[in-house]
Amino acid sequence: MSLLSKTRELNTLLQKHKGIAVDFKDVAQTISSVTVTNVFIVSRRGKILGSSLNELLKSQRIIQMLEERHIPSEYTERLMEVKQTESNIDIDNVLTVFPPENRELFIDSRTTIFPILGGGERLGTLVLGRVHDDFNENDLVLGEYAATVIGMEILREKHSEVEKEARDKAAITMAINSLSYSEKEAIEHIFEELGGTEGLLIASKVADGVGITRSVIVNALRKLESAGVIESRSLGMKGTFIKVKKEKFLDELEKSK
């Protein structure tokens, strides 16, 4: 397969995910397929965002890493010290992705490391490993292209998260501001009683405790539910099950006191 064909295969995957979050496992599998390598896509904190492995599954340490979805902190630190592509790293180098304890299995192995950059900052690392055969120039071009694309996707996800947090905060603020004084007091008392983000509410108990009518509690909950801040489900005589949908709600409620 030519370099152009390999690049197109990676582009096809990204176009398939247009408008939705990219699954980095799919990205890793595509990179693995076109480069015939073991692949790790790692965040700057060492979280494994995506991987596609073959020969490395012979190592118990690698299997454990995959289960934990995290690489060791010391290896993460070493990766973050790599500022530009480093290719054809052998088994005796501390940057090798292959386990040194299985040196005899991976004596001819080669590791290549591509820093993932975006928006002027380091976002993670793309690590490719081969049991045999050096990485050639075409491999490096494809790897650097893949690292660039991954960086763009990580940035897009980060921006989406920031936008979602802003929307959630606005919805929470509007919901809290829509409550009357007595409704807000009722909501504060409800979550003090629950002691967390979800639990069972007995409206009559709260009404008696705060000294308000049950209808005030019902109206307050209805306002929060219509704003998408909480969800509730009647359990009949047992009460009402309440769950917070927007995680910053309780913090914002506390700040508004």
UniProtKB/Swiss-Prot annotation:
<dbReference type="GO" id="GO:0003677">
    <property type="term" value="F:DNA binding"/>
</dbReference>
<dbReference type="GO" id="GO:0005737">
    <property type="term" value="C:cytoplasm"/>
</dbReference>
<dbReference type="GO" id="GO:0045892">
    <property type="term" value="P:negative regulation of DNA-templated transcription"/>
</dbReference>
<dbReference type="InterPro" id="IPR036390">
    <property type="entry name" value="WH_DNA-bd_sf"/>
</dbReference>
<keyword id="KW-0963">Cytoplasm</keyword>
<dbReference type="InterPro" id="IPR014154">
    <property type="entry name" value="CodY"/>
</dbReference>
<keyword id="KW-0804">Transcription</keyword>
<dbReference type="InterPro" id="IPR010312">
    <property type="entry name" value="Transc_reg_CodY_N"/>
</dbReference>
<keyword id="KW-0238">DNA-binding</keyword>
<comment type="similarity">
    <text>Belongs to the CodY family.</text>
</comment>
<feature type="region of interest" description="GAF domain">
    <location>
        <begin position="1"/>
        <end position="155"/>
    </location>
</feature>
<protein>
    <recommendedName>
        <fullName>Global transcriptional regulator CodY</fullName>
    </recommendedName>
</protein>
<dbReference type="GO" id="GO:0005525">
    <property type="term" value="F:GTP binding"/>
</dbReference>
<keyword id="KW-0805">Transcription regulation</keyword>
<dbReference type="Pfam" id="PF08222">
    <property type="entry name" value="HTH_CodY"/>
</dbReference>
<keyword id="KW-0678">Repressor</keyword>
<feature type="DNA-binding region" description="H-T-H motif">
    <location>
        <begin position="203"/>
        <end position="222"/>
    </location>
</feature>
<dbReference type="InterPro" id="IPR036388">
    <property type="entry name" value="WH-like_DNA-bd_sf"/>
</dbReference>
<comment type="function">
    <text>DNA-binding global transcriptional regulator which is involved in the adaptive response to starvation and acts by directly or indirectly controlling the expression of numerous genes in response to nutrient availability. During rapid exponential growth, CodY is highly active and represses genes whose products allow adaptation to nutrient depletion.</text>
</comment>
<dbReference type="Pfam" id="PF06018">
    <property type="entry name" value="CodY"/>
</dbReference>
<dbReference type="InterPro" id="IPR029016">
    <property type="entry name" value="GAF-like_dom_sf"/>
</dbReference>
<dbReference type="InterPro" id="IPR013198">
    <property type="entry name" value="GTP_trans_reg_CodY_C"/>
</dbReference>
<dbReference type="GO" id="GO:0003700">
    <property type="term" value="F:DNA-binding transcription factor activity"/>
</dbReference>
